[in-house]
């Protein structure tokens, strides 16, 4: 952690335990106290780790929680509009994005809501990509050289993936 001085420079550094082999970190207020907490993806644990802001330049690590196989990138937004921030994770070997809904007390719903995407989802971004006023998720898919966009319409109550007739 590098503490900002407000002039483009940073003061000191502090290390906090954040899972095992963490790949990404996202800032999110998981317990609704007005202070930014952190969530890391722990690739080797197949889990996420929440670090709660103690409001004194320290963080307490909560227990790890499942997210899918080989979580790569994490993004945060209020996907449901309930005032609590939620998280989405790209799970590279499952070819899925998992969405866990924030409860506002430092925990998330389990099991997550899984969404199939093209091969090996990696980087992610959130925003209103289709102009409907709702937050969507974009993810890059490494092996297909494409970007998938999961719209809010299908994010919380996903439609089943259709099976082509030749696969029945």
Write out the residue ranges for each language-model feature:
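Glycine-aliphatic tripeptides that mark coil-to-beta-strand junctions in extracellular
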Residues: 34-36, 83-85, 133-135
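Beta-propeller blade termini
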Residues: 3, 23-30, 72-79, 101, ...
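Hinge/beta->alpha junction and helix N-cap segments in small-molecule ligand-binding domains
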Residues: 21-23, 44
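A short loop-to-beta-strand structural motif that recurs across blades of beta-propeller domains
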Residues: 1-2, 47-50, 96-99, 146-149
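Blade-level signature of beta-propeller repeat domains, shared across WD40, Kelch, NHL, RCC1
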Residues: 122-158
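Blade-edge motifs of beta-propeller repeat domains
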Residues: 3-20, 52-69, 101-119, 151-168
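Hydrophobic beta-strand segments that make up the repeating blades of beta-propeller
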Residues: 38-41, 87-90, 137-140
């Amino acid at each position: 952690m590098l503490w900002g001085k407000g002039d483009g420079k940073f003061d000191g550094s502090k290390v906090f335990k954040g899972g095992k082999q963490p790949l990404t970190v996202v800032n999110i207020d998981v317990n609704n106290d007005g202070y930014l907490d952190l969530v890391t993806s722990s690739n080797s644990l197949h889990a996420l780790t929440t670090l709660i802001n103690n409001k004194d330049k320290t963080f307490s690590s909560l227990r790890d929680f499942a997210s899918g196989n080989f979580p790569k990138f994490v993004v945060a937004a209020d996907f449901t509009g309930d005032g609590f921030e939620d998280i989405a994770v790209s799970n590279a070997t499952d070819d899925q994005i998992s969405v866990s809904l924030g409860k506002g007390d430092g925990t998330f719903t389990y099991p997550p809501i899984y969404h199939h995407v093209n091969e090996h989802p990696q980087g992610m971004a959130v925003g209103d990509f289709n102009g409907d006023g709702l937050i969507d998720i974009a993810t890059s898919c490494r092996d297909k050289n494409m970007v998938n966009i999961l719209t809010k319409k299908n994010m919380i109550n996903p439609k089943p993936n259709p099976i082509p007739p030749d696969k029945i």
